[in-house]
Regions:
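HhH-family (HhH-GPD) DNA N-glycosylase catalytic core used in base-excision repair
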Residues: 1-236
Length: 236
């Protein structure tokens, strides 16, 4: 099954450019079709007239109109004012604190998931939307899958509880129908999956892709859940 992030220009996995490619669009990955976002990101990167939006130093020198036009061209930015502002803020942070290279953020935090999350959340105004619990955890997961960055403490990457993951969790019986109305439903689902995999060889984020695809495909695949299995006792 093809994932949204598979739409990429095939850059060297350990390169600065590759790490930036999988970072900047992620901050705009909310309330939209992820496949279309990454298709737009790839088209933007491969167009010589727009590729410089992936260069933080170039972005900080662009006028508001220049950045907006580049991001809107292939619809990386769906909100023509807000989305370019988010993109510019992230680029400014990368330039001011990490010499325009997102890899330096990981180095500064010893490639530790726990430290990286603590740093970004502690400086959330510098990382608009990327610092949110859903996007932050999923971004870290994507970085482990599509870049050469080797993160320590992978178990601290929690399930990224978007609509599909929540629906799949309910389908499995991990949460009840009435739980959907909880104000903290995302945090609740994330915590339950942490409990399910506590002290096992698996990490919570390992179930994100299967759950996401299962829900997105309308639960076409039939899955039998052994509700006596100790892995599910904490959540049921």
């Amino acid at each position: 099954e093809v994932m949204p992030e598979d739409a990429n220009p095939g850059l060297s996995k350990d390169s600065k450019e590759n790490c930036l490619y999988f970072t900047l669009p992620m901050a705009l990955n909310y309330q939209r079709n992820s496949y279309k976002l990454w298709e737009a990101a790839k088209a933007t990167y491969e167009d010589v007239e727009t590729t410089d939006v992936f260069d933080p130093k170039a972005v900080t020198q662009m006028s508001e109109g220049e950045l907006k036009n580049r991001l809107v061209k292939y619809k990386v930015a769906l909100q023509p004012n807000k989305h370019p502002e988010i993109w510019r803020k992230l680029c400014a942070t990368l330039c001011d604190d990490f010499d325009g290279d997102i890899r330096n953020l990981f180095i500064k935090n010893d490639n530790s998931v726990e430290k990286i999350k603590e740093y970004i959340v502690g400086n959330k105004k510098k990382f608009p939307y990327l610092s949110g619990p859903k996007i932050l955890n999923y971004w870290l997961y994507v970085m482990t899958q599509y870049t050469a960055i080797d993160l320590a403490g992978r178990e601290y990457i929690t399930v990224a509880p978007d609509t599909h993951v929540i629906q799949a969790s309910m389908k499995l019986g991990l949460i009840k129908d009435e739980d959907k109305s909880r104000a903290d439903i995302r945090e609740y689902v994330s915590t339950l999956w942490e409990e399910v995999f506590y002290d096992t060889e698996y990490c919570p984020i390992d179930v994100h892709t299967p759950l996401w695809l299962w829900s997105r495909n309308g639960f076409a695949a039939q899955i039998e859940v052994d509700k006596d299995n100790e892995l599910f006792q904490s959540g049921l």
